[in-house]
């Protein structure tokens, strides 16, 4: 299936873009959602994370304490690479399985760390980047998440720089204005992707 890899930094508007694609009837696979599913209590991935990072990253109810783990991996590059080595092969396997089960002209795979991880070797045909200035990313993330400016800064520092994302983009969704403006851009891309999918060689 013709597949779009949708990416962008924290607070860029990936979720809003993905929601619009879904409203247009496009199958959307979100790797963040998959990561949450893979780390449910009792899962093999959570057992490996516990063994690798210790009980400090496990909440009292046995679930993954995501804020604790996030703080750790965003200040420790080695820990971040270790976590990625655990999760990314599992995520890639699940993305491929879900894509294989879909029907329709095209699908969207939301991959926040597409650039940072070399796309997980993800089976994407095109890359769409949701883009905005860093100051907007920071303001939006603080407003929605309650993270401190320092915590947001650490996340941004661990992500690919804006120029690196734009360098790999086939399409750019500029999210510096209203939600309506973002949705209009997604609508235009939807028509383009339908055409590209229809004209794709078997």
UniProtKB/Swiss-Prot annotation:
Residues 3-200 form the DPCK domain. It comes from Thiobacillus denitrificans (strain ATCC 25259 / T1). Belongs to the CoaE family. Keywords: ATP-binding, Coenzyme A biosynthesis, Cytoplasm, Kinase, Nucleotide-binding, Transferase. Pathway: Cofactor biosynthesis; coenzyme A biosynthesis; CoA from (R)-pantothenate: step 5/5. Catalyzes the phosphorylation of the 3'-hydroxyl group of dephosphocoenzyme A to form coenzyme A. One of its GO terms (biological process) is coenzyme A biosynthetic process. The keyword Ribosomal protein does not apply. It is an enzyme of class 2 (transferase). GO terms for cellular component: cytoplasm. It comes from the Bacteria. Pfam families: CoaE. It is found in: Cytoplasm. This is Dephospho-CoA kinase. GO terms for molecular function: ATP binding; dephospho-CoA kinase activity. ATP binds at residues 11-16. PROSITE patterns: DPCK (PS51219).
């Amino acid at each position: 299936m013709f597949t779009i890899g949708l990416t962008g930094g924290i607070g860029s508007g990936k979720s809003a873009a993905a929601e619009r694609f879904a409203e247009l009837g496009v199958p959307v696979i979100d790797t963040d959602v998959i990561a949450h599913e893979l780390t449910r209590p009792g899962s093999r991935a959570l057992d490996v994370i516990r063994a690798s990072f210790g009980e400090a990253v496990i909440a009292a109810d046995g679930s993954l304490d995501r804020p604790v783990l996030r703080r750790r991996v965003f200040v420790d590059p080695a820990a971040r690479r270790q976590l990625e080595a655990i999760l990314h092969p599992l995520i890639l396997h699940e993305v491929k399985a879900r894509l294989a089960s879909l029907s329709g002209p095209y699908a969207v795979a939301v991959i926040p760390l597409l650039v940072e991880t070399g796309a997980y070797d993800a089976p994407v045909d095109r890359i769409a980047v949701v883009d905005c200035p860093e100051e907007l990313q920071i303001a939006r993330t603080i407003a929605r998440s309650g993270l401190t400016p320092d915590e947001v800064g650490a996340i941004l520092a661990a992500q690919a720089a804006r120029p690196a994302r734009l360098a790999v983009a086939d399409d750019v969704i500029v999210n510096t204005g209203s939600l309506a403006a973002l949705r209009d851009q997604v609508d235009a891309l939807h028509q383009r992707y339908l055409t590209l999918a229809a004209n794709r060689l078997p």
